[in-house]
Amino acid sequence: MNNKKAGVLLVNLGTPTAPTAAAVKTFLSEFLHDKRVVDMNRFIWCPLLHGVILPIRAPKVAKLYQSVWMEDDSPLMVYSQRQVSALQDRLSLPVALGMTYGQPAIKSGIELLEEQGCDEIIILPLYPQYSRTTTAAVFDQIGKQYKTTSVLPNFTMVHNYHDHPLYIKALAESIRLSWKEKGKGDYVLCSYHGIPQRFVDNGDIYAEHCIRTTELLAEELGLNSEQIGMSYQSRFGREAWLQPYTSETLKELAPKGIKSLDIISPAFSVDCLETLEELSEECKEIYMTAGGEKYTFIPCLNDDELHIEMMAAIVSSKISRS
């Protein structure tokens, strides 16, 4: 095996370049134009998106980004770059970053690796649970960006890692660390990003993966169904999404006697707007208003050592041995 010829591309969803309405509008436009995300008829969706949704949502979302923006960049970008650096040190291989939407583009990341002499590229979408809305969208971007290229790079793409032992171990250790530092709550709620129920009805395996991740995490922590559960957050639009919804679940827990809650989002590999603002702040308010007394938000795995170890193990298993 010639490690010098192998390179790694970490892929995440993307982020606005700045916490401004203009930057958020540009990012959301690209994201919500993807048929993997919204498959509504284009003649209906595009006028609705540009005439109603973006003008209203962009300024509101920009204010939310301002509340979590870090000194150097957005949280998603900062933590993603830390992952790149840590994984590169761990593997002693070139590692680059690509975003499905926005910059740096997936193609830019691949070209950067090729410039470093990589002729075998392992693409690791940082979505533990597969979905057409995330992992499949990465496939689409690669196909679109290399549509007119005569000779394609040698790609190997990771499909999912929802049940990888090191992933489950890393999640469990992050929860145990929270218990050690902040005390153990009555219940652990695993809040996953939601997708339309219709996508699952049409064959998306995302929900199956989320359920399995939760089951394995419960086993690792030694928790029963009265001590751990799952829900889905970030619903968009009026269509039915995967249930139970996190917002509704939070309203029900305290009246059932669960007065202290630990909440984690296993589907996110790095902290971002959906975890730092929605899960940490909005959801806390819902739970406390419903009668909760203690709400502990557990951060994403980010560049945690066990998380990087997991990535390294996955990549190493994909590199050619010939």
From Swiss-Prot:
InterPro entries: Ferrochelatase, Ferrochelatase_AS, Ferrochelatase_C, Ferrochelatase_N. It comes from the Bacteria. It catalyses: heme b + 2 H(+) = protoporphyrin IX + Fe(2+). Fe cation binds at H193, E274. GO terms for cellular component: cytoplasm. GO terms for molecular function: ferrochelatase activity; metal ion binding. Keywords: Cytoplasm, Heme biosynthesis, Iron, Lyase, Metal-binding, Porphyrin biosynthesis. It is found in: Cytoplasm. Pathway: Porphyrin-containing compound metabolism; protoheme biosynthesis; protoheme from protoporphyrin-IX: step 1/1. Belongs to the ferrochelatase family. Catalyzes the ferrous insertion into protoporphyrin IX. This is Ferrochelatase. It comes from Aliivibrio salmonicida (strain LFI1238).
